[in-house]
Regions:
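Hydrophobic membrane-insertion alpha-helices, especially the h-region
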Residues: 1-21
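Alpha-helical transmembrane signal-anchor/signal-peptide segments
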Residues: 19-43
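Secreted/periplasmic serine-hydrolase-like ester/acetyl group-modifying domain
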Residues: 30, 150-294, 398-416
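Catalytic nucleophile-elbow at a beta strand-turn-alpha helix junction centered on a G-D-S/GDSL motif
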Residues: 53-75
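Membrane-embedded segments
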Residues: 69-159
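Extended hydrophobic/aromatic segments used for targeting, binding, or gating
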Residues: 82, 280, 287-293, 297-361
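C-terminal regions of proteins
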Residues: 93-95, 329-330, 336-416
Length: 416
């Protein structure tokens, strides 16, 4: 007796979602809030970011990265853009543990919004660990809409095959596994396969629009992430005046340790394990990692979508580097490998701060920019975004998808 009404109710919900319109009304206030929410939902879900990035009256720019976006202070890019009413607003896309593979699949949800646009992309050398990042971290930021968006847009090329292979490695029980395996094996998808993908892609897109209208999680973050700092900054823009203000804030908030870290971070993340952390990173290397191949996925997408990115390479807090025993020569060799992969293919807009980790108040903690680091970031990024230019011609090299490159630790100029 109960089964019939439940079945009918389920069918009605399915039909409601399937025929729900995908376009959302633009609301600048809501879009500004979602842009700085820095929640898991704002990172991986489609509707809020697509709505903002397609707003004809405000230019939201994707800022891709990981957890650095959560380090807010008076010089944070979202704060400066709002305070000085710049021609753009950052849309912050990143979470702790996310790296290029998550970013690539997230991009599949918003390809029309990336076409011929500028973006900011932070590349942290810490991403390039021996085994890449944990499958659990990847899965946390992946969803069915990303999957069907990828399957719908894939072209059967080497990038698609590599992405499918990595997806199976990171998510062995992924939905539609048989289709992903076909791509990984370079098998052609059948007409029936493509029809199913299209049907599920439409459903996922409409489901995202339907539930996205109720998504307010993280909206309150706008006040504590942005509004609270606006009144601390001078009304007239001046780098020197802003530097004086954020430097005073940094001095006040790095007073309980000798490592130049924010007090709260030091108290909660470092202090209790300080002795154990001494020389704990002596054996770390970032030279051999699948992340180099994952990065190539992103570069391939940028080339296909004619995106003009600026890449940011952050430093490690120098005091922390020395204390933890992280080798400076290895770090710089990693940076050179990353830069070679970028520059040799035509991605030449790079702000390399990798040698600035010893500058006072440049870092918020061990590896994240803050205060004067954000100001240096702004001096590189704001002129780039305020004077938009088309993407240059890229010259992609598929060798960067190879295991040879992922594990190469020699002179980059000698790589064949």
């Amino acid at each position: 007796m109960i089964f019939g009404p439940v079945l009918i109710a389920g069918l009605l919900v399915f039909l409601l979602i399937f025929f729900y319109p995908t376009e959302m009304r633009h609301n600048l206030g809501a879009e500004k809030r979602s842009a700085v929410a820095t929640t898991i939902d704002s990172f991986k879900e489609r509707s809020q970011k697509v709505r903002a990035l397609s707003d004809p009256n405000m230019r939201f720019v994707p800022f891709f990265g990981s957890s650095e976006w959560l380090r807010f202070d008076g010089a944070h890019p979202a704060v400066l853009a709002e305070k000085y009413n710049r021609s753009y607003r950052p849309y912050l896309l990143g979470q702790r543990g996310a790296a290029s593979l998550n970013q690539y699949f997230g991009m599949q949800q918003m390809l029309p919004q990336l076409e011929n646009k500028q973006v900011v992309y932070v590349i942290s050398p810490q991403w390039f660990s021996k085994n890449g990042y944990e499958p659990a971290a990847f899965q946390q930021y992946f969803n069915g809409d990303q999957l069907t968006s990828f399957l719908e847009h894939q072209s059967g090329d080497q990038a698609s095959q590599y992405a499918a292979t990595r997806l199976l490695q990171q998510f062995p029980n992924v939905a539609m596994k048989d289709l992903v395996q076909k791509l990984a094996s370079k098998e052609e998808l059948s007409t029936a396969d493509n029809e199913m993908i299209e049907l599920l892609a439409r459903f996922n897109e409409r489901q995202a629009s339907f539930f996205g209208q109720f998504s307010v999680r993280g909206y309150v973050n706008y006040d504590k992430h942005v509004v609270k700092y606006l009144k601390t900054l001078p009304d007239q823009f001046s780098y020197q005046a802003i530097e004086d203000i954020v430097k005073a804030d940094a001095e006040k908030n790095t007073s309980n340790n000798d490592l130049g870290m924010e007090n709260y971070f030091y108290n909660t993340q470092i202090k209790k394990d300080l002795k154990k952390l001494k020389d704990s990173q002596k054996s770390f290397t970032y030279l051999k990692s699948p992340e180099y191949n994952d990065l190539q996925l992103v570069l391939t997408q940028f080339s296909k979508s004619r995106v003009n990115p600026i890449f940011i390479i952050p430093p490690v807090n120098k005091k922390w580097m020395d204390y933890a025993g992280l080798r400076e020569d290895m770090y710089q060799q990693t940076v050179q490998k990353i830069r070679y992969q970028l520059e040799s293919q035509g991605f030449t807009n790079i702000a390399d701060f990798s040698k600035d980790g010893g500058e006072p108040f440049f870092m918020k903690d061990t590896i994240h920019l803050g205060w004067l680091g954000w100001l240096a970031f702004d001096k590189a990024v704001d002129p780039f975004l305020s004077n938009p230019t088309p993407a240059p011609t890229y010259h992609l090299n598929e060798r960067f998808f190879s295991k040879d490159w992922a594990t190469y630790d020699g002179d980059v100029k000698e790589f064949q």
